[in-house]
Amino acid sequence: MDLILLLGIAVALLVILVTLFFFTKGKGSQESGKYNHPRVENEAQAAPRRAQVVRNQRNRARVAAAPAEEQHHAAADGGSDEDEIPHADFNGEKMGAKKRAKLEAKAEKKALREQELKIREDQKKKDALLEEQRKVEAEKEAEEERKREEAEKKAREEKARQEHEEYLRMKEAFSVEEEGFDQEQEDDKQNMLQEFINFVKSNKVVVLEDLAVQFKLKTQAAIDRIVELQKDGRLSGVIDDRGKFIYISEEELNAVAKFIKQRGRVSITELAENSNNLINLVPVSAE
């Protein structure tokens, strides 16, 4: 930029010198025509004039260089967007037009910046409004989702409650049926036990193994059952060493007791000899 300024100053000086040359030449011609005689100057008088002319040229060069320097400073203040190369111009009207154009350009740029700023602000407001609308929509969707989940939860809870109530009703029904079934089983068990007792009473003498087979029991289970029935007083008798059970009724026991009481002292041999008369060992079905 300094090189351009120097070139401008040099061009301005050159223009001034050329202008002064033609101006001086024209003035000399006019003076020679006015007085109609050649002007003879003294060398002693011409030297100061030449010095004055040189001083005047320098002053005019400084005056011409001042607008160019001002133009350079204005270009520096205007920013990098001013790419024009300043040129020396001595016409005040032309310099005013350039300055006016520059001011108009600055004003236009300022207006453009303000317009862009306004557009950005409007866009920010629009974006903020859209963001607010998105937030409202998101909150609305979240509320609808919450209500939908709550409704689904209530529906699941209601369904679970109904299923639980149905389960309780079915359980109660099964319990009643099971109680009836248990009662039936108990009745069957009592019936089987009574059949067991009746079988022993009717046969009088039963082999324990055959008794177990008859009622689908193990031999030990049959023996245990007889022992329990004896404790309950529902059966009476003895189990001999040959694996048989001899049923003795209440009447027969009373007869044996009466026989022993009448005889006083009775031996086992005497009791065995009279047992056939006291105890009936014949099965009821065979009688």
UniProtKB/Swiss-Prot annotation:
Chain spans, region Disordered: 28-102, 135-164
UniProt keyword annotations, A-Z: Endoplasmic reticulum, Membrane, Transmembrane, Transmembrane helix, Ubl conjugation pathway
One Pfam family recorded for the sequence: DDRGK
InterPro entries xref list: DDRGK_dom-contain, DDRGK_domain-containing, WH-like_DNA-bd_sf, WH_DNA-bd_sf
One GO term describing the cellular component: endoplasmic reticulum membrane
Bias type Low complexity, positions: 44-68
Membrane topology listed for this record: Single-pass membrane protein
Residues in compartment: Lumenal: 1-5
Basic and acidic residues bias spans: 85-102
GO molecular function annotations of the record: ubiquitin-like protein ligase binding
UniProt subunit comment: Interacts with Atg9; the interaction is transient.
Family: Belongs to the DDRGK1 family.
Protein name: DDRGK domain-containing protein 1
The species this protein was found in: Culex quinquefasciatus
